[in-house]
Regions:
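Short, well-ordered loop/turn sites that connect or cap secondary structure elements
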Residues: 48, 91-94, 197
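A generic structural signal for residues embedded in beta-strands
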Residues: 56, 99-102
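Short, conserved secondary-structure segments in the cores of folded domains
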Residues: 44, 87-90, 193
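Intrinsically disordered, low-complexity linker/loop segments enriched in Gly/Pro
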Residues: 106-199, 204
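Short, structured beta-strand/loop micro-motifs enriched in basic residues and often containing a Trp
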Residues: 29-39, 79-85, 180-188
């Protein structure tokens, strides 16, 4: 059955938004290798048209290596190989200088018993002094907190349930020349960690 948008005046004039959207799935198997840098040197794993929907299976920033509260990041992670990213996703017709709009429809926790992770990591993050951001206070001890989570809430404890308000930490266009660490925010986007970049939002 033909979608009404395909026969619209806007579609006949070639406007990208006037095409019936297709839905693509980018599973872990289809993604294959996840990336720790963002740049023009990785081959596309998916090609879509403007207006298409993409369902993406992502990994957490620790790539699933922090499974329990005993898995200290300093022991199980190999920096800077963290914050793995999906993609690249090629948008047909997109050219240098274009403005892209990404609408985030929904975010659903993965797995039978999804758990979030909070952690204090030595030499990493806003609460820990680094060579670039020295603090007068002593470093906080390294600690991991695993938290049950579903679409109804974030279960900090038996008495405390926090609202479920997910957001995408890293979203990016490819820089023209550079290959940039996925932990870095910059003009291309990257690791922005914006709480506003969640379901119902549009990122330009």
């Amino acid at each position: 059955m033909t979608h009404w948008l395909d026969k619209s005046l806007a579609a006949m004039r070639g406007l990208g938004w006037a095409k019936s959207p297709r839905t693509h799935e980018l599973t872990e198997a289809k993604q294959g290798v996840y990336h720790y840098t963002i740049g023009p040197y990785s081959s596309e794993v998916l090609r879509i048209a403007p207006g298409d929907r993409v369902i993406v299976e992502t990994r957490d920033a620790f790539e699933g290596k922090v499974k329990t509260e005993e898995d200290l990041p300093s022991k199980v992670l190999r920096m800077p190989f963290v914050n793995p990213q999906n993609g690249p996703i090629m948008i047909e017709g997109a050219e240098k200088g274009d403005v892209l709009a990404v609408y985030i429809e929904s975010m659903i926790p993965r797995g039978e018993n999804p758990r979030g992770t909070c952690a204090m990591i030595p030499q990493f993050g806003a609460l820990s002094g680094t060579s670039l951001t020295a603090l007068l206070a002593e470093d906080l001890p390294e600690i991991v907190r695993k938290i049950d989570v579903d679409e109804q809430g974030v279960y900090w404890s038996k008495r405390v349930t926090l609202p479920y308000k997910p957001h995408i930490g890293t979203l990016s266009c490819s820089p023209e020349i550079d290959s940039i660490n996925t932990l870095t925010p910059d003009q291309h986007g990257g690791n922005m960690d914006l709480p506003d970049m969640g379901p119902g939002s549009i990122t330009y």
